[in-house]
């Protein structure tokens, strides 16, 4: 298993550490689906041609974007990506199968989100408008600047999302 190998190698390295691999999107997307179902009783659909998931209920369509991370490295967004709600999956404790899911009920067109400072000089909106990929760390950039717009909706072991138990 690559995660175990990375962890073991990092114990022996004193100057440079090996960064964790990107968290697999198909896993983060399913974690979010089941976290939404656990919280709201609504199961998003993964079969969508835009974004990562969608909720279709009573003629209302909610486009969902999902970002998973295992380190403080930046999450990257396509400059033309569109969503109605954004979810971050904190997979830093993936070795123990513990995850956190954060919900942000802001679209990428919302001024609060567009005004997130990703650098000293540029906001999310300015970078996206210039057709470049906005990038930022959830813990260092998004969570602190979003404040009450960023809600923890799940914090626990993956087995807690199994609605068949």
For every predicted segment, state its role.
Residues 1-59, 66-165:
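Nucleic-acid endonuclease domains
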